[in-house]
Swiss-Prot record:
Localization (cell): Cytoplasm
Name the UniProt record assigns to this protein: FK506-binding protein 1
Recorded name of the encoding gene: FPR1
Keywords associated with the record: Cytoplasm, Isomerase, Rotamase
PROSITE patterns to which the protein is assigned, alphabetical: FKBP_PPIASE (PS50059)
One example GO MF annotation: peptidyl-prolyl cis-trans isomerase activity
Organism: Yarrowia lipolytica (strain CLIB 122 / E 150)
Catalytic reactions of this protein: [protein]-peptidylproline (omega=180) = [protein]-peptidylproline (omega=0)
Entry keyword annotation includes Nucleotide-binding: no
Family statement: Belongs to the FKBP-type PPIase family. FKBP1 subfamily.
UniProt entry tagged with the keyword Cytoplasm: yes
Amino acid sequence: MGVTVKQLQPGDGKTYPKKGDAVTIHYVGTLENGQKFDSSRDRGEPFKTTIGVGDVIRGWDEGVPKLSLGERSVLTISGDYGYGERGFPGLIPPNATLVFDVELLGIN
C-alpha cells in the first residue's frame, strides 16, 4: 500500500518540502485501532527532522513532501513503509499500519 494522504485542512498549495529540507511538524501517531503511541502535541513541542534522507520512516519520507506549508492531513502508512517486521517493541506491533495526523508547520 505505501502511504495515503487524506487532507483535513489545506495549506498554501504552493510551498512543498523537498528531499533534504528540514521540516517542523506537529503529529499524533496511532495504530489502526486508535491506540496512540506518540504525539508531539502531547509534548507541547513540534518535531523537527530532515525529509527524504532516511531519518524517519519511509512513509514520512514519501508522504510529507505531498503536504504544502500549513496543511494538516492524515497519513496512513502500511507496515512495510513504517516499522516493518520488527515493529517498535512495546509500542508498535510487527507489520502494523500506522495513522498519523500531521500538520506541516515549517520548511527550513
